[in-house]
A protein has these predicted regions:
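Glycine-rich loop at the start of a catalytic domain that most often binds anionic cofactors/ligands
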Residues: 36-43, 97
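Thiolate-centered catalytic microenvironments shared by cysteine-dependent enzyme domains
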Residues: 61-159, 176-177, 191, 241-259, ...
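Cysteine-dependent PTP/DSP-like catalytic domain, specifically the C-terminal lobe
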Residues: 256-279
């Protein structure tokens, strides 16, 4: 394990003081793509995960040219401090964080507690569009060491040399349901990847949306045999919830070798010849 990096988290107080600083850009990324327009942190820009943080033609993360265009149009260059936040305890803020790290952005942080905490504290919200002077952004070569692909997951299952963490709900893990309530059922089969441990993503957070303490998180994962000594692969349904768990293990606990399998259950659950476990 490496030393943890608490500088990847900022408080709501910090954001209130620095949101409009030169060199800082606050970005909201929500599950509910209408939330930003209903009110957001003054000075923030909004990214739509369904159109701006994925390849809309090929199932994949955002292509590098689209990422560069998105960041540049958001007033972000390579030296900008990006502060991400969103609803649902920062589900898609973590998804954006993971992709930004893949493309090598150095200073990217998450506002602890997300939109939930900001609103609960009665802080200001704005419906005004943020003024963003267009900048030039140049992404680095994609760091695929942060991402697990199907062959690696298949090898991990066969060799049993990596820990698999299923971050979905218990009902998804057991196969009782195929997707969270209200979301499309995109899989043919229910269950989980053989050998995976069930550690639902929500257990990483307190009731106010903030992350649990280092000691609490370390104990929770250790109780399931996840200590960071062996490689870890996290997955969910499409990779967004598991990106939050990846963030916790990689940046809050300091695990050296942890990857997000964004193919997740929509890939594995539909794959011909792939084994599925059910209790």
């Amino acid at each position: 394990m490496t030393v943890t990096m608490p500088n990847v988290l900022v408080t709501t107080d910090w954001v209130a003081q620095h949101a409009t600083d030169a060199g800082v850009r606050v970005v909201e990324v929500d599950v509910d793509t209408t939330a930003f327009d209903q009110g957001h942190i003054p000075g923030a820009v909004g990214w739509n995960w369904t159109t701006q943080l994925c390849d809309t033609l090929v199932r994949d993360i955002v292509p590098v040219n689209k990422l560069e265009e998105l960041l540049g149009s958001s007033g972000i260059d390579n030296k900008t401090t990006i502060v991400l936040y969103g609803d649902n305890n920062n589900w898609f803020a973590a998804w954006a964080f993971w992709q930004l790290k893949i493309y090598g952005h150095e200073d990217v942080r998450i506002m602890d507690g997300g939109r939930k905490k900001w609103v609960a504290e009665g802080r200001d919200l704005s419906t005004d569009a943020a003024a963003a002077q267009k900048k030039t952004y140049k992404a680095k070569t994609a760091d695929t060491s942060l991402r697990a692909f199907l062959p690696e997951v298949q090898t991990a299952v066969a060799a049993k040399k990596a820990a698999l963490v299923d971050v979905r709900s218990p009902d998804e893990f057991t196969g009782k349901i195929l997707a969270p309530p209200g979301l499309p059922e995109t899989c043919q089969r229910g269950g989980h990847i053989p050998g995976a441990k069930s550690i639902p993503w929500g257990k990483n957070c307190n009731d106010d949306g903030t992350f649990k303490s280092f000691d609490e998180l370390k104990a929770m994962y250790a109780a399931q045999g996840i200590t960071g000594e062996a490689p870890v692969i996290a997955y969910c349904r499409i990779g967004e919830r598991s990106s939050l768990t990846w963030f916790v293990m990689k940046h809050l606990l300091g695990f050296d070798n942890v990857k997000n399998y964004d193919g997740s259950w929509t890939e594995w659950g539909n794959l011909v010849g792939a084994a599925v476990e059910k209790p």
